[in-house]
Structure formats: C-alpha cells, structure tokens
UniProtKB/Swiss-Prot annotation:
This is Phosphonates import ATP-binding protein PhnC 2. It holds the Pfam family ABC_tran. Keywords: ATP-binding, Cell inner membrane, Cell membrane, Membrane, Nucleotide-binding, Phosphonate transport, Translocase, Transport. Residues 2-245 form the ABC transporter domain. It comes from Roseobacter denitrificans (strain ATCC 33942 / OCh 114) (Erythrobacter sp. (strain OCh 114)). ATP binds at G34, R35, S36, G37, A38, G39, K40, S41. Gene3D superfamilies: P-loop containing nucleotide triphosphate hydrolases. Its EC number is 7.3.2.2. Its main location: membrane.
Length: 271
C-alpha cells in the first residue's frame, strides 16, 4: 500500500532523514517518536510533497509519489492530508469556512476568489464538525475557539479532502492533557471508522502506546525502532531518545486519571 524506500533528505552537509525505509500493507495508525531534531517532521513533509527528497522513493498503491509536480502533486496532497501543531487556520474566518478550505484545490479560481461553496459541501462540512463534537462552533471565528477545538477544526478541514492518509505533525504538542486526549481519540476514530491510514509525530510515549497500532522511533535521522506498542519498553525508549539511566517516562506523560478509559478502545485492543 505505502512503501518508503531509503528516503533521505539533506540540508547542505546535514542529513535530516537518513535512508528511512517503511512498508505499510494496510490502513494503520502509526506513531513516530523521537527527540527534537530526529527527522520526524522532515519525513512527514516529504511524504506530503511539501519537501523534496534528496534520495529514495515513496510509492502509494503502485504510484510513484517522489518528485510529483503541479496538478499531480496537488492531487496527492488531497489524498494525503496534513495537519500541524500550529493549526494553520484563518483566525478571523468562521469555523465552517475554515473547514471548507479543504476543498480549495478542487474549485475554480472564480469560486475561490468570491468564497462560493456548493450547498452539498457546506452540509458535509457541518456533518464533519458534528462528528468531531464541535458543530455548535460552526459560525464562530476560529480565533474564539480553544486550542483543542481549533485542532479539531484542522482535522475537519483535512477530512473535507476525503484523504486516504492523514499526516499529523505534533498534533497535540501545544495542547493541555485533556484536549490532547480528545484530539487523539478523534484521530483513532477516524482510522477505525473510515479505514484511513493515520501517521502522527508524537512527543509522548504513553500517547504512542495507547492510540497507535505501530510505533516507529527515529534518532539522528535514522529509524532505530519499528514495532508494536508492547515492544516499546523503557529500555527501547532510552535508546531512541539517547537518554541515560535516569530517563523517566513520567516526565512526558499526558495521562489523566479521570480520562483513563476513553470513549473508544485503546490500540492494544486491536493488536
């Protein structure tokens, strides 16, 4: 389904991603972990064609993705949607219009200039917002929403593209623990209910273990771990993060006792 073969990205003499190889045979929820500068974001940007690879290839369903240009690249970016830590919403625009921006590459220049949307798209946008629990916020400006709500708007915008893959670059890094769990539960539901592949860069081990079927660890641009959440032991984590014997997972935990049992089963239930 998705094959990443020896993918490499260099910035001058620095190698940000070094011969990354990943094979995904079916829609899966994958968490990528590693310290800052490990190459996680660069890897996702190459997957989305926001950044070109120095070497290596990306293939999805038999189609070569590496090096796409113009309309072909825009089409791929619709099939492989991306959300970011910063949300990237238009603050003074209402929520539903932000969601509808997910259809921009499918609309004419005239429709884009005058902000014209078909009723069917508007209804679909509201349905997606309702699915994410924020339909009542549709008419509000994006800037009036909390961080967790804004990230769900960004997810809704991605879903408007009807993608096969959702890439999430540190989607909960700027959120409090409660909102972080709401966002991760939403991504897990999208994977389970829609059969979409979700690949998320994550900064906490407990989040990767709880929500992901597969965890990939990166260190200094290289993939040093690729396995199940159960295989992600403290010793393995120490190696991924290059930490000493004093390494503590608790320092990065996002667990909340009150939310210990989410509305959906954890990833372990699907292992």
């Amino acid at each position: 389904m998705l094959t990443i073969d020896k993918l490499t990205k260099r910035f001058g003499e620095k190698t940000a991603v070094d011969a990354a190889t990943i094979r995904v045979e079916k829609p899966t929820m994958i968490g990528i972990i590693g310290r800052s500068g490990a190459g996680k974001s660069t890897l996702l940007r190459m997957l989305n064609c926001l950044s070109s690879a120095s070497e290596g290839t990306i293939t999805f369903e038999g189609e070569e993705i590496t090096g796409l240009r113009g309309a072909a690249r825009r089409n791929w970016q619709s099939r492989c949607a991306m959300i970011f830590q910063q949300f990237n919403l238009v603050p003074r625009m209402d929520v539903v219009s932000n969601v509808l921006h997910g259809t921009l590459n499918k609309r004419s220049t005239f429709a884009t200039m005058f902000n014209l949307y078909p009723q069917s798209d508007i209804h679909r946008a509201i349905e997606i917002l309702d699915r994410l629990g924020i339909a009542e916020q549709a008419a509000k400006r994006a800037e009036a929403l909390s961080g967790g709500q804004q990230q769900r708007v960004a997810i809704a915008r991605a879903l408007m593209q009807n993608p096969k893959i959702i890439l999430a670059d540190e989607p909960i890094a700027s959120l409090d623990p409660m909102n972080a769990q709401v966002v991760m539960q939403a991504l897990r539901r999208i994977h389970e209910e829609d059969g979409r592949m979700v690949i998320a860069n994550l900064h906490t081990l407990d989040t990767a273990r709880r929500y992901c079927d597969r965890v990939i660890g990166m260190r200094d641009g290289r993939i040093v771990f690729d396995g199940t959440p159960a295989q992600l032991t403290t010793g393995v984590a120490r190696d991924i993060y290059g930490a000493g014997a004093g390494f503590s997972e608790a320092a990065t935990s996002t667990e909340i006792d009150a939310l210990d049992k989410p509305d959906i089963p954890t990833a372990k239930a699907y292992a």
